[in-house]
From Swiss-Prot:
Coiled coil: none annotated. One of its GO terms (biological process) is tRNA nucleoside ribose methylation. It comes from Haemophilus influenzae (strain ATCC 51907 / DSM 11121 / KW20 / Rd). S-adenosyl-L-methionine binds at residues 78-80, 111, 131, 138-140. It is an enzyme of class 2 (transferase). This is Uncharacterized tRNA/rRNA methyltransferase HI_0380. Its EC number is 2.1.1.-. Keywords: Methyltransferase, S-adenosyl-L-methionine, Transferase. InterPro entries: Alpha/beta_knot_MTases, RNA_MeTrfase_TrmJ/LasT, SpoU_MeTrfase, tRNA_m1G_MTases_N.
């Protein structure tokens, strides 16, 4: 899912910001970087990427905003809290939730260091992402903004994955109470015949062990099959004697 997210940097003037943004992306599992008319991509870009050189190296470099987002069906642009954008303003957490729920390609666009995105560029965005920083000092540099948004994207991605894992647990086929009771009775009977269980304390511990294991039905069938094989061996031994 994260591979569908493209971070777009518009006309970045400080080459080091490109490297720092790439580092911020990689720490959160993002890999798709697009640069629109950067002033330069140089040694400082690579030096400040600090292990994310591959993201800088593989960054797509284009000439315009339109070219950067041409194959994306959801475009989110960073913006100050402007009155005429109130209906489309979202904060990083809401942005991340929308992004991870989306099926197509997504571009998250960060504007120029000094002036951000132009009004024309903002009009081409479906949503406008505003970071609710301290109003008395709201100055975030480009890489900081990328790090913050990338973090929220990763957290939303992990939450979504946890939900999927929870659903997969629910969908697993677990034995009924009656089936477990049959298994426990069968286990106790076989183990008693082997002389393994001398008192109920051992059986209680075995039950706790099996409950902790959260046996699925097919796993219980395997254990019942093992008990059946042991029972047949016991019967054969009795016949031989």
């Amino acid at each position: 899912m994260l591979e569908n997210i493209r971070i777009v940097l518009i006309e970045t003037s400080h080459s080091g910001n490109i490297g720092s943004a790439a580092r911020a992306m990689k720490t959160m599992g993002l890999t798709q970087l697009c640069l629109v008319s950067p002033k330069s991509v140089d040694e400082q870009s690579y030096a400040l990427s600090a292990g994310a050189e591959n993201i800088v190296k593989n960054a797509r470099v284009v000439d315009s905003f339109d070219e950067a987002v041409d194959d994306c069906s959801l475009v989110i642009g960073t913006s100050a809290r402007l009155r005429h954008l109130q209906n489309t303003l979202i904060e990083p957490r809401e942005c991340a939730e929308k992004v991870v729920a989306y099926k197509g390609k997504i571009a998250i666009v960060f504007g120029r260091e000094r002036i951000g995105l132009t009004n024309e560029e903002l009009l081409k965005c479906h949503y406008h992402l505003n970071i609710p920083a301290n109003p008395d000092y709201s100055s975030l540099n480009l890489a900081m903004a990328v790090q913050l948004v990338s973090y929220e994207l990763r957290m939303a991605f992990l939450v979504q994955n946890n939900k999927k894992n929870s659903l997969s647990l629910i969908e697993k086929n677990y034995p009924t109470t009656d089936q477990l009771a049959y298994f426990f009775d069968y286990t106790e009977r076989i183990y008693q015949s082997l002389g393994f269980i001398q008192n109920q304390g051992v059986m209680r511990k075995l039950k706790r062990l099996y409950y902790r294991a959260k046996l699925e039905k097919n796993e219980l069938n395997i254990l019942n099959g093992m008990l059946s094989a042991v029972e047949k061996r016991i019967d054969l031994t009795k016949e031989d004697n």
